[in-house]
């Protein structure tokens, strides 16, 4: 293909990408791919200037305005910035600035993050917001006045005084990471469209024809400059932004001065290191010559100013090809699809694999083997496939098939079933996860189960990393967690990584793990959907392993933050004969669970007959109706036996009929009696009024840990406090009851002193625990 043909092809492709990005809000390629195509066209046109035409993408900023909005002409064009991708590019920009100004000393720059959102213009007349517009093609944008008025941090009227009669403010409308997560969760729950990233969400939300939809979205605005202004408001870029802030307009908290390009590079590196912890997405840093006089002297070239540049971060999104989809087996037997990719650099790292989560995600993406896809990598997050580029799908692309047999052990692979209970009826539906039924006979599940069991937050067996566990399994020395306690010195000494000293240390660590807290033991079992916090809830509320094993799913839902699906996972785990055998083997190895005892006082006192009735999910009967029913009929037997007349004396006719119909079903009668019998057997006592929790000495108190503890880890200290009923928080406030401060305590200790909060050093804390009967 000759230069002229390539130029025509590039223009056509870029025009199509612009249309998809600006008009349809459906980007078809990542920014990095667009930049490569644009720069290739720019270079070809520089080599062949006679081929440059006015309608080339290099001669304008973006795409056409949406026809559904009225158009707005920008009095001062909204130009885009040149890009720097390497440090050398930024230094070259700095050299051009110095040459253009011909002034001694370092040039003063402004530095601010390049937010990943939608550029907008806000026009104020006499301090009142009268118009909002998108950038559009840089000369003509879309009138989105009604929508920008719904963005909460955009002032409808400027504060203070001294603003010019005409003031055009420019900035970025964006969506924070937290706001994006909330929006997508709400969209998914409502069965609506979810967004690929915060930028798409912000653009799609701001360009809604119905401003009520925009108002419901968590949009934010940040100023980065001005357009037309009827009177001077400053002589420097930072000075102007500070003035805008004084008038009530939000500016970046990361705005900084830099003296010379080397300080600009230091800013770029610093914010790059903090990028993933920022509350919003950024794709680079913008540097501008701070002096307006210097800006005027440097002027513009083609589509961009000579006095500003955007230093981009390595692309977080890239295009690549799906070579295959393989399936991995996890600790719970979940068979998870993983995309094998043609290697590509993303965010500075070569990526050849990406998670696909489950088959529902593959269906949502419409993914086939052979497809070209957009992948995204942010920080330490596993690379994800974000979108399929359908225009590039080859004719021989193949659908992804779930294996019928486990790729590791050959056992059958089954789709999980989800249980839901509504209006007294239980229904099951297919889940998104497929599982291998091989359990610990499956090498992959066995290895992952052992790795989880010995991990720091589980049984904390030091000296057993992933490679060591794999070696012990491959050598046939362990076939279940219980086999760890049967290991002998002569079996492990001489294995790779195990000399005499390390072998002895490992056996000592295994022996020391025989006295875990109940919560640690439950967590170590690897129950599906039971994390560390849920394990603590089970241990703290039910008080013994036996009660956790016996608990009905409906009883488990009485515990904080445990829903019916998780409750069934717990119940089914302990109903499984294989799991029961493993637990029996572990207990038979001399395991002594600590902290076992009675049912938690606050749990025992909080459950009432009315609460139980309300949780049966009888149509039309909520907590208030259940209270009325129990006030009239004070036992489950009376409620089940009641006729329509008795029920109507307590409830409205519709509710009374619902109760009667519910208990006509013998299965519902049995369920209610089973729940009541178990609650009473556990130590519940019906009381129509909810009691205040008693029995735990620190119930209702908030404690804070700070500094380094020498006699125990902070995780252990947290466990001890939680076992006494305390809530352990991460910051000090007026509601904090006590702070435990070890060596190196800093701002939290200072805050406690300022607020007059009680402080214990580690020695005093150990004495306190001893007084409560808690061993160290």
UniProtKB/Swiss-Prot annotation:
GO biological-process terms attached to the record: DNA repair; DNA replication
SMART domains documented for this protein: BRCT, HhH1, LIGANc
Highest taxon of the lineage: Bacteria
GO function terms (MF aspect): DNA binding; DNA ligase (NAD+) activity; metal ion binding
A Pfam family: DNA_ligase_OB
EC number: 6.5.1.2
Function according to Swiss-Prot or TrEMBL: DNA ligase that catalyzes the formation of phosphodiester linkages between 5'-phosphoryl and 3'-hydroxyl groups in double-stranded DNA using NAD as a coenzyme and as the energy source for the reaction. It is essential for DNA replication and repair of damaged DNA.
Protein name as it appears in the record: DNA ligase
Source organism per UniProt: Pseudomonas putida (strain W619)
Primary gene name: ligA
């Amino acid at each position: 293909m000759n230069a002229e043909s390539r130029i025509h092809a590039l223009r056509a492709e870029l025009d199509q990408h612009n249309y998809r990005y600006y008009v349809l809000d459906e980007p078809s390629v990542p920014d990095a791919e667009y930049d490569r195509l644009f720069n290739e066209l720019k270079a070809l046109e520089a080599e062949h200037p006679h081929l440059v035409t006015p309608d080339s993408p290099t001669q304008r900023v973006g795409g056409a305005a949406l026809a559904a909005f009225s158009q707005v002409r920008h009095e001062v064009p909204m130009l885009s910035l040149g890009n720097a991708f390497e440090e050398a590019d930024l230094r070259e920009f700095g050299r051009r600035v110095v040459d253009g100004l011909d002034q001694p000393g370092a040039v003063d720059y402004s530095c601010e993050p390049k937010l990943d959102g939608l550029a907008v213009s806000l026009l104020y007349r006499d301090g009142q917001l009268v118009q909002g517009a998108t950038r559009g093609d840089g000369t003509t944008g879309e009138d989105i006045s009604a929508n920008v008025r719904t963005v909460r941090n955009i002032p409808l009227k400027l504060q203070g005084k001294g603003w010019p009669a005409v003031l055009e403010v420019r900035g970025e409308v964006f969506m924070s990471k937290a706001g994006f997560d909330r929006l997508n969760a709400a969209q998914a729950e409502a069965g609506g469209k979810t967004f690929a990233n915060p930028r798409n969400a912000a653009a799609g939300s701001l360009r809604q024809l119905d401003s009520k939809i925009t108002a419901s979205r968590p949009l934010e605005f940040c100023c980065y400059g001005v357009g037309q202004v009827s009177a001077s408001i400053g002589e420097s870029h930072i000075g102007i932004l500070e003035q805008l802030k004084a008038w009530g307009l939000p500016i970046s908290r990361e705005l900084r001065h830099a003296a010379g390009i080397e300080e600009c590079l230091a800013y770029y590196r610093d914010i790059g290191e903090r990028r993933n912890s920022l509350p919003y997405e950024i794709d680079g840093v913008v540097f501008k010559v701070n002096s307006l006089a210097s800006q005027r002297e440097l002027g513009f070239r083609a589509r961009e100013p000579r006095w500003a540049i955007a230093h981009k971060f390595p692309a977080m999104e890239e295009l690549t090809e799906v070579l295959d989809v393989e399936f991995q087996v996890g600790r719970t037997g979940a068979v998870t699809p993983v995309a094998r990719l043609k290697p590509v650099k993303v965010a500075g790292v070569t990526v050849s694999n990406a998670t696909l989560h489950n088959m529902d995600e593959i269906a949502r993406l419409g993914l086939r083997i052979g497809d070209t896809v957009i992948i995204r990598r942010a920080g330490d997050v596993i690379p994800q496939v974000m979108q399929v580029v359908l225009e590039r799908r080859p004719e021989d692309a193949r659908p992804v098939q779930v294996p019928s047999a486990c790729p590791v052990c050959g056992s059958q692979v089954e789709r999980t079933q989800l249980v839901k209970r509504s209006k007294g009826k239980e229904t099951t539906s297919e889940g998104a996860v497929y599982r291998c039924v091989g359990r610990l006979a499956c090498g992959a599940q066995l290895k992952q189960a052992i790795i989880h069991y010995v991990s720091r937050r589980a049984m904390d067996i030091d000296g057993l990393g992933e490679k060591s566990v794999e070696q012990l399994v491959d050598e046939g020395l362990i076939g279940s967690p219980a086999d760890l306690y049967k290991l002998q010195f002569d079996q492990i000494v001489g294995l790779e990584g195990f000399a005499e000293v390390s072998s002895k240390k490992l056996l000592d660590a295994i022996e020391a793990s025989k006295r875990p807290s109940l919560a640690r033991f439950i967590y170590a079992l690897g129950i599906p959907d039971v994390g560390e916090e849920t394990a603590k809830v089970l241990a703290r509320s039910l008080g013994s392993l036996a009660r956790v094993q016996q608990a009905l799913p409906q009883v488990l839902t009485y515990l904080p933050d445990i829903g019916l699906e998780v409750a069934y996972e717990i119940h089914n785990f302990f109903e499984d004969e294989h799991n029961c055998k493993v637990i029996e083997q572990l207990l038979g190895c001399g395991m002594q669970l600590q902290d076992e005892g009675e049912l938690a006082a606050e749990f025992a006192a909080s459950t009432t007959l009315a609460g139980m009735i309300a949780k049966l999910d009888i149509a039309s009967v909520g907590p208030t109706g259940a209270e009325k029913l129990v006030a009239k009929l004070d036992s489950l037997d009376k409620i089940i036996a009641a006729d329509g007349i008795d029920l109507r004396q307590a409830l409205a006719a519709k509710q009374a009929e619902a109760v009667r119909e519910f208990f006509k079903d013998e299965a519902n009668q049995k369920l209610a009696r089973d729940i009541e019998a178990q609650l009473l057997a556990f130590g519940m006592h019906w009381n129509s009024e909810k009691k205040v929790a008693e029995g735990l000495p620190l119930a209702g108190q908030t404690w804070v840990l700070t500094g380094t503890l020498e006699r125990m880890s902070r995780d252990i200290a947290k466990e001890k406090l939680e076992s006494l009923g305390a809530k352990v928080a991460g910051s000090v406030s007026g509601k904090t009851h006590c702070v435990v401060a070890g060596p190196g305590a800093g701002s939290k200790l200072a805050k406690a002193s300022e607020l007059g909060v009680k402080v214990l050093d580690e020695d005093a804390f150990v004495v306190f625990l001893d007084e409560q009967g808690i061993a160290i």
